[in-house]
């Protein structure tokens, strides 16, 4: 998870790069941003939905300083100053967005399940993949692409081809320019009888 990712990345850095880490709290929504080497780790927390998540960004440059001022965040890298989100707060590059959930067990980790479907509230276009084998964490099966233009919608996909497993995790990738949002992800399953 995030600790493993950060520790593995830190092992690739020099002591000077580790000591030069920079951080800031985004003034509008309270996100914590930590830059370490050329990576930025961002912690987001949404109390009303009880969701907390880490995002990782490959900046391609090392941030030496952050400043939060007048509701905006500025980052310095060498002799260049960057304004996160641009002047309007809505300007971003076309880098793909990848959302990966941890393994989900439905609060019944020892119960085998037949996954029968799922519901999602989303905006934008998302490639959806699943993994049901913790021994092969990089083995993903494509189950479809959500395409709905730019409006937030509820969609359902049939997951019966996934088969049986006590766990499932999702990877959703958006590679299109424009808004992209995932608001809810609900999994439907039936418990399988034990042998």
Segments predicted by a language model, with ranges:
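Surface-exposed loop/edge segments in extracytoplasmic proteins
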Residues: 50-57, 135-145
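Acidic, low-complexity/disordered segments
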Residues: 76-96, 151, 165, 172-176
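Beta-sheet-dominated scaffold domains
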Residues: 1-91
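Short edge beta-strand/loop segments characteristic of extracellular beta-sandwich folds
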Residues: 117-121
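Short beta-strands within extracellular/lumenal beta-sheet-rich domains
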Residues: 89-113
């Amino acid at each position: 998870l995030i600790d493993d990712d950060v520790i593995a990345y830190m092992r690739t850095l020099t002591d000077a790069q580790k000591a030069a880490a920079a951080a800031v709290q985004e003034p509008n929504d309270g996100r914590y941003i930590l830059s370490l080497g050329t990576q930025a780790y961002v912690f987001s927390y949404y109390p009303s939905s009880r969701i907390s998540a880490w995002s990782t960004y490959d900046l391609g440059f090392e941030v030496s300083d952050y400043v939060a001022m007048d509701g905006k965040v500025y980052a310095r890298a060498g002799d260049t100053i960057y304004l996160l989100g641009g002047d309007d707060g809505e300007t971003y590059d076309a880098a793909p967005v990848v959302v990966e959930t941890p393994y989900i067990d439905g609060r019944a980790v020892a119960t085998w399940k037949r996954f029968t479907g799922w519901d999602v509230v989303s905006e934008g276009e998302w490639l959806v993949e699943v993994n049901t084998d913790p021994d092969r964490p990089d083995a993903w099966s494509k189950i479809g692409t959500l395409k709905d233009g730019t409006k937030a919608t509820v969609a359902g996909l049939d997951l019966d081809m996934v088969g049986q497993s006590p766990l499932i995790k999702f990877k959703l990738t958006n590679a299109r320019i424009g808004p992209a949002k995932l608001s809810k992800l609900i999994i439907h399953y039936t418990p399988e009888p034990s042998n």
